[in-house]
Amino acid sequence: MKDLISIIDVKDHVGETVKIGAWVADKSGKGKLQFLQLRDGTAFFQAVVFKPNMIEKFGEEEGTAKFDEIKHLSQETSVYVTGVVKEDSRSKFGYELDVTELEVIGHSHDYPITPKEHGVEFLLDNRHLWLRSKRQMAMMQVRNAIIYASYDFFAKNGFIKFDSPILSGNAAENTTELFETDYFGNPAFLSQSGQLYLEAGAMALGRVFDFGPVFRAEKSKTRRHLTEFWMMDAEYPFVTHDESLDIQEAYVKALIQGVLDNAAYALETLERDTSMLQKYIDTPFKRVSYDDAIDLLQAHENDEDTDYEHVEHGDDFGSPHETWISNYYGVPTFIVNYPASFKAFYMKPVPGNPERVLCADLLAPEGYGEIIGGSERETDYDLLLKKIADFGLDPKDYDWYLELRKFGSVPHAGFGLGLERMVTFVAGTEHIREAIPFPRMINRIQP
């Protein structure tokens, strides 16, 4: 309806009569007053109904009947509400609505998620309704702000959107984590990453990025893992590893700034410490080599406040190691030049040290772990062919990818950012399941 306004816009209509389409999230009151907590997807907002005002407008009989109807509104009833916008310093939102008229659109009966504590599994079983809560709405607004900030960053920095396929005949990362499906009698796999295809795009179009769902058949039940999640991949030619880190740092800072600018109310709802987010924007990220990080972990492994296991050079980090490192530095931290033995086949070796590769993981502080993985790519055809074979992969599956090295290969690099991990970090929430509308985990594929 053209005459409706959104709750988020009521600040521009103080003293005016407005009409809002909303749902009744909660209700309280006594005697001649009723307080309605309304939501419309943009914000939550209190509407106040005063019985004498209803009687004055509609007469004794009709006004009383309308007030009684409002008293008995059930949770999640949809309504059109008309009233005068007033400033309210007691409200976090800062405004309230003095109701003059209310029309019920759709009734709600026996809404399962009542205003009380519920178990996580119950809430996930009712995820289609849990999304209506104040916290979950805020999470989706943070997610939305990050997505829009991503598109804005890439547009301003000369990137072209390049869509990679969801179905693929080969693996980009770990073949043990593939979801396999039948493709007209032949095996196909759900995409783990659009990166290989982005390399083709970069050789044709220059700076490219991709944004879409990816799938990992990891049997992990941690707070950081989903089997289906969204990945923002970027690839760029004529860029070295160190230059790539500069781009990644600028990108992450732009995402945080985008949320501060466009989802401040959501961060307030989530009680996120925005001074920490501002610190991450204002402070240069740390860059630490893998071997220096191992030395640091070994030096502090007997400290009273450490809870990670001993690691040797050549070992991969676990979540406790990542958490400790990022908290030690207090800002997002790049760990660079990991061992080639547990990194992807397409990564370029460190010059003079083939046991290490030109790659980096960006670890978020406050215990959020890796949010970006990136590397400079191998450009030599023969070396890449050997790496594919060494990883036990069939070179025939990568014929097209290898050909990129035969026809004008250039230095190039790129990275992938896990959207849900970034949302979890910026929002300051504990579990990744709240960072996506309908989480897919090892034990959940419904609703």
From Swiss-Prot:
GO terms for cellular component: cytoplasm
First and last residue of the signal peptide: none
Substrates-to-products reaction catalysed: tRNA(Asn) + L-asparagine + ATP = L-asparaginyl-tRNA(Asn) + AMP + diphosphate + H(+)
Parts of the chain that traverse the membrane: none
Major location (coarse): cytoplasm
Any Gene Ontology biological process: asparaginyl-tRNA aminoacylation
Gene3D superfamilies named among the record's database cross-references: Bira Bifunctional Protein, Domain 2, Nucleic acid-binding proteins
Intracellular or extracellular location(s): Cytoplasm
One of the record's GO molecular function terms: catalytic activity, acting on a protein
Pfam families: tRNA-synt_2, tRNA_anti-codon
Keyword Cell membrane: no
Subunit structure comment from the entry: Homodimer.
Assigned protein family: Belongs to the class-II aminoacyl-tRNA synthetase family.
PANTHER family reported for this sequence: ASPARAGINE--TRNA LIGASE, MITOCHONDRIAL-RELATED, ASPARTYL/LYSYL-TRNA SYNTHETASE
Protein name (record): Asparagine--tRNA ligase
Organism: Lactococcus lactis subsp. cremoris (strain MG1363)
Highest classification ranks of the organism: Bacteria, Bacillati, Bacillota, Bacilli, Lactobacillales
